[in-house]
Structure formats: C-alpha cells, structure tokens
Amino acid sequence: SNVTGNIYDLKKIKSRLRKETFFLVDGSQSVPNFSIDFQDIGADALVFTAHKMMAQTWLWVLVLKNQRIKELSPLIVWGGTIKDATISGFDLQKNNQKFEAGTPNIIGAVSLLHALEFIKTLSPEQTLSGGMQAIWQHEQELVRYTLKNFEQLWNAVQLIGSQTARRVALFSFVLRDEQNFNRIWEFFAEQNICIRCGGHCAYPLHKHYHLGGTCRMSAYLYNTTEDLDRFFTSLSELIKRQR
C-alpha cells in the first residue's frame, strides 16, 4: 500500500476472485523493494513506476500474461502498433508491440536498465535477485528503526494502518493537534526534508480512516538511520511548537 506500507497476500486475494476477473496488481511500492515472481502471484497484469527504483520519471512498466496480450486491445493506436493498413481498416500487431504506440521513452528505458545494473552490484554474486535481497534487508533495518522512533511519539502522532514488520519503508501519519497539511509540509521543506502530504491518490482509504489526508515519509536504499534521526528531530520540534 502506498499509504500504509503494508504488504498484502496476493495469492489470498486471487483465491477470492471470480475466475473471469482481470487481476491487475499495482506494484509501484513493491517491485522496487523486494523480488516478485509474476507467475507465482497469479496476476493477469503487473504495473510499476520506474522512478521508484532509481530510474527517471515518466516511465511505467506493464507486464502481461501472454494470453492477456492476445485478448486485450490497445488504448491508443499509433506508429508501431499497426501491422498493416488499408483505406477501409487496419490490422494490429499480434504481440506486445500493439501496446507500444509512438516513440517510446528511450531515455527512461535506458535509465531503468542502468538502475537494474546498479542493483546487481549490491550483491556479492552480482545478480538482480541478490541485489533486491540487499535492498530488502537494508529497508527492514530502516523500518524497525522508524517504528521504534514513532512509538516514542504515539501521544502526538497517529500512524495509519497496522504497524507490522511485514511492510515497506513508507509511513503515513497525522499529528493529533495539527490538521493543516500545508503547514506541516512547509515546515519539513524548510528543514530540507521532503515528505508528501495529501490523499496520495488513495482517497477511499483515507475516508475509511475518517481522514482528509495524511503526511507520508518514505525511505529507500539511499537513506540511512542518520537521515531518519534528522526527520524525527524535526518532527519533535514541530510537535513542541504546537504546545
């Protein structure tokens, strides 16, 4: 979840779906953090954003089952998607090319390739799976450290979702005595700390928690416990100013 950071049991979700249901998984918060076996999770499609794993922005990746590639039609028909055309009609490409209309984001694709090559260097065996495992282990250290620090502020800060160890390193929170998200965001910006405040494209979930929005702090491979110390020092200072 891009709000709670929790990791869901996709196989369990899949088992509760009707056979004809198209099962699409948004892996933007999971693919950058740990290895996913697309065939194992039983999804029809998996999407993720490349910039969340250190590539450039404006690049999305769509993984489809072969059968779904045959069944689905493209949203946009443009250069590269057409196999043949006449005055009266056209024939689409039969493979994944029918979904790749126009000039692709070449720079973005190259940046993702280099990001993946860098991730390989994180493991002694120089493999992608080993690099992803290194990211996961580092992130779990940050998760434990972050939860421990938030526990000390429980009377002033509310974390959203179940705070379990099975999660990625993003944390959405609200201050119990401050609902002005712009003020919170501006305060952290003044400390050169980047957080996001708002609905995070998940308004129904926020309504479930009876909240108009939350502030979200995220950590990744390039963050350290020293970075987290700076965040919590600033958060504590903000809480003091409210009193």
Spans of features found by a protein language model:
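Pyridoxal 5′-phosphate
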Residues: 1-243
